[in-house]
Amino acid sequence: MKNSLIVKDNALINASYNLELTEQRLIMLAIINARESGHGITADSKLEIHASDYAKLFNVSADASYKALREAVNNLFNRQFSYTAEYKRTGKIGIVRSRWVSRIFYVDDLALLEITFAPDVVPLITRLEEHFTKYEAKQVAHLTSKYATRLYELLIAWREVGKVPQLELKEFRNRLGLVDNEYTAMSDFKKRVLEPSIKQINEHTDITVTYEQHKKGRIISGFSFKFKQKKQPQIEAKRDPNTPDFFVKMTDA
C-alpha cells in the first residue's frame, strides 16, 4: 500500500478545510481503498479502513492506529470543507460547502472503520480525467504535521512548473485550515506552521521547497513557493560473487 496513489481533483486540493492529521490520513486511506477497488465508487459505497493498514502505512503503533479510528467516529463525521464551483446555468462561480462523509460505522472488536463519502466528494476523487493532482502515499507517510501534509498537496498541484504563484495570506491560511484566531502574529505563524512544515517536507518527501514572502508596505500580505524534485538515488546492481568473470564481462560489455 505504500506505493498507492492519492488522486484528488484540484478543486479538492485547493479547498478550505481543517482536518487533524489523523483525519487527513483516514481520508487518504479511503481514497486508496476506492481506487484499488477497481470498479469505482458511488455515494453509497462503503469503504473499509483497518487499523493495521493505518499502522503500516504511517509507521505508527497499533494503539495509535486504534485511537485514530475511534476518534474518527465523532470528529470526522462533523468535518466540512468548502470549494469554488461553477453554476452551470449561468457560468457564475459560487461556493460549495459539504461534509466529507455521510456515514461512519466503527467496529471496535475488529479495529475496523467503514465510511461512506458524501455525494459531493465522490466525483472529486474518482473518474478524474483532467485538472487533478496525484502523489504517492509514501511521500506524506512520515509527515507529522497536519499543515505539512496540506502544504505538500498545495505545492505538488504545481509540479509541472515547480513554483506556486503568490497566495494571499488569508487564502493561504484558509487552505491550511487555520481559523481566524489561530497564530495571528506573523512570527507565530512562521514558527508554528510555515517553517516546521517546510522543514518536514524537505526532510521526508520527494521535493525541496523554499518560500518568498510578499509585502504591501511593511505588512506581509502573502507567500510564493519554489520547489524542485529531489534526485532519486541510483541502485547499483550487486554481483553474485559466485558468478564467473567471463559472464560478468559479457554483462558489462
Model-derived features: where do they sit?
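Charged, alpha-helix-forming regions
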Residues: 1-253
